[in-house]
Regions:
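Short hydrophobic "helix-edge" motifs at membrane interfaces and signal-peptide entry regions
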Residues: 28, 53-55, 280-281
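A cross-kingdom marker for long, charged
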Residues: 258-314
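Boundary at the C-terminal end of the N-terminal hydrophobic targeting segment
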Residues: 40-44
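Alpha-helix C-cap/termination motif
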Residues: 22, 82-85, 278-281
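Bacterial N-terminal signal peptides
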Residues: 20-37
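N-terminal secretory signal peptides that target proteins for export/translocation
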Residues: 1-21
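Structured, acidic catalytic/metal-binding patches in enzyme active sites
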Residues: 49-259, 263
Length: 314
């Protein structure tokens, strides 16, 4: 088993909910890998659920895995009860609303690809593009499917395909589970970010070619990452989730510090501030964000505690 930490693309996909929208854009590709869904019951799995309270207001914080499988369900009764007792569902981005918004889908597509006449191979080294071609050949995916993708989007897309090949599915994601309920029952849905904003943030990364190359070189690490992150989430183990999503990557690649600052710590500050503001307008909120945002130093959880919330895992 490879002892390296999971690829940066894997970590990004696990934490950026908007990238589940690519299931529509590349569904033909994803269909190449039929998922083997597990049937084990999950009602006794703990999951990562925290309760934050301040001045009589309650905020439930559920750490999401944006790709999951049937073995995650049914969720623990306490999780479903917390959702049903809340006034509103708070998510990073409402991907279900986006799926019915053709104009937004077009904006996302325009942000994700190069303009006509410009291609991915023109913007990365021949070495990196050769690595991508080798992977495409192995997966029997046409080069044209990736030829105009921007580097960061290509990195996330191939990570999605590899994670799906290992049995995880965006349609089974924890956030999507609650969004489906909320849309069905007309529950108020509030967004901390936006789909388009997350895509634009990815495209603003410095040196995305480096992250694409690192992802291509360490794809085999997903073989160990998928069962490890699944186990960590089901047991509600905050330390293991932190190790997998953040600490191991920074220990192995300290040069990625600015990347983590942008994708985790800056976003944590922005999301924590918005949660604080929303909590003043509702008695009870049910917040679903990527699990990596709730664990460790400079997490949403820590920032809420600094603002006077009392937080406990339940």
């Amino acid at each position: 088993m490879n002892n390296h930490s999971p690829t940066i693309g894997t970590r990004l996909y696990a934490q950026l909910v908007s990238l589940a929208l690519w299931q529509k854009t590349i569904w033909v590709l994803a269909a190449l890998f039929l998922l083997q869904a597990h049937t084990a019951q999950a009602a006794s799995d703990r999951g990562l659920l925290l309760e934050a309270q301040k001045d009589g207001q309650t905020v439930y914080l559920l750490g999401s895995i944006h790709l999951a499988d049937k073995s995650f369900y049914p969720l623990r009764e306490e999780i479903e009860r917390a959702y049903k007792s809340s006034d509103a569902l708070v998510v990073e981005a409402d991907i279900l609303a986006m799926e019915s918004n053709a104009a937004l889908q077009m904006q996302v597509m325009q942000e994700s690809v190069y303009p006509p006449g410009e291609q991915l191979k023109d913007n990365v080294s021949p070495e990196v593009y050769g690595q991508l071609l080798e992977w495409l050949n192995q997966r029997q995916i046409p080069e044209a499917s990736f030829s105009r993708l921007r580097p960061a989007i290509a990195m996330i897309t191939l990570s999605l395909i590899e994670m799906q090949a290992r049995g995880l599915d965006p349609k089974a994601g924890i956030d999507r589970h609650f969004l489906s309920q909320a849309h069905r029952n007309n529950t108020q849905i509030l967004e901390l970010e936006s789909v388009l904003g997350q895509i634009q943030m990815l495209n603003s990364l410095d040196n995305p070619e480096l992250y694409l190359q690192q992802t291509l070189e360490q794809l085999s690490d997903m073989d160990s990452f998928v069962p490890r992150i699944t186990s960590a989430w089901k047991s509600g183990d905050q330390e293991k989730i932190y190790d997998l999503v953040i600490r191991e990557g920074l220990d192995e690649h300290p040069e990625y510090g600015p990347l983590y600052e942008l994708l985790f710590y800056k976003r944590n500050q922005d999301m924590a501030k918005k949660i604080q503001d929303l909590s003043g307008q509702h008695n009870t909120l049910f917040v679903v964000v990527g699990a990596g945002h709730l664990v460790g130093e400079k997490s949403i959880t820590e920032l809420l505690e600094q603002d006077g919330f009392t937080v406990k895992q339940i």
